[in-house]
Amino acid sequence: MSTLFVADIHLCAQEPAITAGFLHFLRTRAIAAQALYILGDLFEVWIGDDDPNPLHHEIAVALQALTQRGIPCYFIHGNRDFLLGKRYAAACGITLLPAQRVMQLDELRVVILHGDTLCTDDNDYQRFRRRVHQRWLQRLFLSLPLQLRLRIADRMRANSLRANAGKTADIMDINAQAVMAVMDDTGATVMIHGHTHRPAIHQLPGERRRAVLGAWHHQGSAIEVSTSGVMLHEFSFGG
């Protein structure tokens, strides 16, 4: 059996086609897998496990159905949903993982992560990331009224869009030295990540590979690891 990896689905109520496509993926492709790993940005925004958004319940039910069939599901936080907590994970039946995880899949030593920590040339983003990952600041934010959290999140997203519009594509992409440092430190032969929305499988020195997941904007994207190797799949939301 194969292990599946996805990232950057960016689920939100404003994009029902993406939601339908992801639910179809869970019922068809994921149900035939040995395990499913979601490498961040499952949701476009996450302001707390107490958000009563009906979409969150719908996704929790679908993921719970998958795990109840004996297919484990694991989650690494992204830059959009880094506040997703234990309460929602329990509702989904998924297991929360640290920001970086090393695993052995058959003969492959694989390191998985969301990918934003590899974009070390984007100094502004890395400073922002360090700030919002401070525990005290997260606790303060989650203590605010829900509607205030939503307004803050909307403002932060708008600021991010404006900031990214002034950055070059190279700055927002991964840093090759950062990639090699992670692979050297972990001894991994394969790296799988998302975040950049640039799906591809890159050959690296020393017979190593970096597999990048695509975003679920107009089609689905998944990486499959099996005895046949590492494969990138892109498919229609109904396929």
Swiss-Prot record:
Membrane topology note: Peripheral membrane protein
Protein's UniProt name: UDP-2,3-diacylglucosamine hydrolase
Enzymatic reactions: UDP-2-N,3-O-bis[(3R)-3-hydroxytetradecanoyl]-alpha-D-glucosamine + H2O = 2-N,3-O-bis[(3R)-3-hydroxytetradecanoyl]-alpha-D-glucosaminyl 1-phosphate + UMP + 2 H(+)
Location in or out of the cell: Cell inner membrane
UniProt binding sites for substrate: 79-80, 122, 160, 164, 167, 195
Record-linked CDD domains: MPP_YbbF-LpxH (cd07398)
Residues that hold Mn(2+) 1 according to the record: 8, 10, 41, 197
Gene for this chain: lpxH
Species annotation: Sodalis glossinidius (strain morsitans)
Lineage: Bacteria, Pseudomonadati, Pseudomonadota, Gammaproteobacteria, Enterobacterales
Keyword Membrane: yes
Residues the record lists as binding Mn(2+) 2: 41, 79, 114, 195
Function per UniProt: Hydrolyzes the pyrophosphate bond of UDP-2,3-diacylglucosamine to yield 2,3-diacylglucosamine 1-phosphate (lipid X) and UMP by catalyzing the attack of water at the alpha-P atom. Involved in the biosynthesis of lipid A, a phosphorylated glycolipid that anchors the lipopolysaccharide to the outer membrane of the cell.
One Gene Ontology MF term: manganese ion binding
